[in-house]
Amino acid sequence: MATEAASINFRGINGRGMGAPILLIMMLAMIVIPMPPIALDMLFSFNIALSLVVLMVTVYALRPLDFGIFPTVLLITTLLRLALNVASTRVVLLNGHTGTGAAGKVIESFGEFVVGGNYAVGLVVFAILVIINFVVVTKGAGRVSEVSARFTLDAMPGKQMAIDADLNAGLITQDEARKRREEVGQEADFYGAMDGASKFVRGDAIAGIVITLVNIVGGFLTGAALKGWTLTESLSVFTRLTIGDGLVSQVPSFIIAIAAGLIVARAG
């Protein structure tokens, strides 16, 4: 009996989509296993493209429930960015002494082209982007999610009573009443999930600041203490790589935060 039950459960699991479990395993692998620069380039490019796709879907969604899986997408993209941060930090600290191309072309491009190769300008741009993301977009989206969840839950009994009244009056059929009840429940579940998922966006913004500071200090110690570099050399190389790493992570984070703000602020 136990063998038969295990076989049934395995067949049920095998029949479902395995995309999310595989993605989570890949994230764990990125945290534990050192990754080559070309793999980081592909993953960073995928992360930016994914954030743009999420933003486009959010913009064209007529109602929040049209993109009902957004809280799950928000969590997965946040975990992906954090895993990429850990993987890129390892590469920067281990191979940063070989030059600005040690962590891949994407990080090098953000460090060289976007900020003109000047790490002082890069620090200012990164700080401004983090402040806008953390103080304005993320905080506002989190507050809207919290208020929307509260009012949606408070309005549930009234909506259910209105549906029952329409059904008793013969204005709607049983199927229409069932559909409306499902929509009311889905709306409450969505805003409740967004209220919790918005905390991940806020935590991701804080983690981006901390990781950048740790990278700068770790890069300085690696260059000065282990490689015998001067302060200027260590700051020039590792800070440039760190700023490139920070920007390539904060840009998709900023885009996802905008998408979260758009979908929770949309009425209806």
Positions of predicted regions on the chain:
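Juxtamembrane helix-loop transition segments at the membrane interface in multi-pass membrane proteins
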Residues: 2-10, 40, 47, 55-76, ...
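Hydrophobic alpha-helical transmembrane segments
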Residues: 20-24, 30-48, 59, 68-78, 113-139, 199-200, ...
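N-terminal accessory targeting/assembly segments
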Residues: 2-5, 20-25, 31-32, 52
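N-terminal membrane topogenic signal
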Residues: 8-21
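Canonical hydrophobic alpha-helical transmembrane segment
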Residues: 53-55, 250
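Alpha-helical transmembrane segments of integral membrane proteins, especially early/N-terminal helices
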Residues: 9-12, 85, 89, 206-218
